[in-house]
From Swiss-Prot:
<feature type="binding site">
    <location>
        <position position="6"/>
    </location>
    <ligand>
        <name>3-amino-2-oxopropyl phosphate</name>
    </ligand>
</feature>
<dbReference type="GO" id="GO:0005829">
    <property type="term" value="C:cytosol"/>
</dbReference>
<dbReference type="GO" id="GO:0008615">
    <property type="term" value="P:pyridoxine biosynthetic process"/>
</dbReference>
<keyword id="KW-0963">Cytoplasm</keyword>
<feature type="binding site">
    <location>
        <begin position="8"/>
        <end position="9"/>
    </location>
    <ligand>
        <name>1-deoxy-D-xylulose 5-phosphate</name>
    </ligand>
</feature>
<feature type="binding site">
    <location>
        <position position="44"/>
    </location>
    <ligand>
        <name>1-deoxy-D-xylulose 5-phosphate</name>
    </ligand>
</feature>
<feature type="binding site">
    <location>
        <position position="17"/>
    </location>
    <ligand>
        <name>3-amino-2-oxopropyl phosphate</name>
    </ligand>
</feature>
<dbReference type="InterPro" id="IPR004569">
    <property type="entry name" value="PyrdxlP_synth_PdxJ"/>
</dbReference>
<feature type="site" description="Transition state stabilizer">
    <location>
        <position position="150"/>
    </location>
</feature>
<feature type="active site" description="Proton acceptor">
    <location>
        <position position="69"/>
    </location>
</feature>
<dbReference type="InterPro" id="IPR013785">
    <property type="entry name" value="Aldolase_TIM"/>
</dbReference>
<comment type="subunit">
    <text>Homooctamer; tetramer of dimers.</text>
</comment>
<feature type="binding site">
    <location>
        <position position="190"/>
    </location>
    <ligand>
        <name>3-amino-2-oxopropyl phosphate</name>
    </ligand>
</feature>
<dbReference type="InterPro" id="IPR036130">
    <property type="entry name" value="Pyridoxine-5'_phos_synth"/>
</dbReference>
<keyword id="KW-0664">Pyridoxine biosynthesis</keyword>
<dbReference type="GO" id="GO:0033856">
    <property type="term" value="F:pyridoxine 5'-phosphate synthase activity"/>
</dbReference>
<comment type="similarity">
    <text>Belongs to the PNP synthase family.</text>
</comment>
Length: 235
């Protein structure tokens, strides 16, 4: 299983003082050097953490894979096509939320989705949808032309005991179903050093995307050690 590191909260810390440090690009390079297989950033419409110049710097510097999380808007479609990350992930976005609160509502946007995706894929960019781990969302993602899905693990992260076990099984079944539908599978949201290890039991999940937990750990031990510790856990 591969590790993709979300560096949004490096930008959050920088923006707290509106100065140049810490630099998200430098953080991304440290993560790559330490074994991360990809870098994730979310260019939100309100630019609350990652900004346009960060994205340009990441595109110039990232050597593994750059995953641009974005809302389904004309502005973000244009930016994606101009920037050409290896991957874009469509996520829901609300101005009042602290972080992405759930999966992309494919049912609601389905009629526009294929047309939105088409020019992005034509630019040589893979497309992922951040979805709830259920068969209906997976079916619609496949029909819309998505290359892969990122299964939302937030509910798993918030639960404990038998409820968490049940949610894990839901994710396991969804991952297998997605692969059967011809989609590649990654997972993310709320994953941390305490709850990640069970995902080693789901071979269909090729990669996990981790941001807040890893950056929080890096505040104490540094990015290289935080990445290495997570890599040890995901095996």
């Amino acid at each position: 299983m591969r590790l993709a590191v979300n560096i949004d909260h490096i930008a959050t810390l920088r923006n707290a003082r509106n100065e140049g440090e810490p630099d998200p690009v430098a953080a991304a390079l440290l993560a790559e050097e330490s074994g991360a297989a990809g870098i994730v950033c979310h260019l939100r419409e309100d630019r609350r953490h990652i900004r346009d110049n960060d994205l340009k710097g990441l595109r110039r510097s990232v050597k593994t894979k750059l995953d641009l999380e974005m809302a389904m808007t004309e502005e973000m479609q244009r930016i994606a096509i101009e920037t050409v990350p290896e991957l874009i992930t469509l996520v829901p976005e609300k101005r009042e939320e602290l972080t992405t609160e759930g999966g992309f509502d494919i049912e609601r946007h389905f009629k526009r989705l294929a047309l939105f995706i088409e020019p992005i894929r034509a630019a040589g960019i893979e497309v992922s949808l951040f979805i709830e781990p259920d068969s209906r969302s997976i079916d619609l993602a496949a029909e819309a032309g998505s290359d892969l899905v990122e299964l939302h693990t937030g509910s798993y992260a918030l639960k404990s005991g038998e409820e968490q076990t049940a949610e894990f099984e839901r994710i396991r079944h969804a991952a297998k179903y997605a692969v059967d539908r011809g989609l590649k599978v990654v997972a993310g949201h709320g994953l941390n050093y305490r709850n990640i290890q069970p995902f080693r039991q789901i071979p269909e999940i090729e990669e996990v995307s981790i941001g807040h937990a890893l950056i929080a750990r890096a505040a104490f031990v540094g990015i290289p050690e935080a990445v290495r510790e997570m890599l040890d856990l995901i095996g």
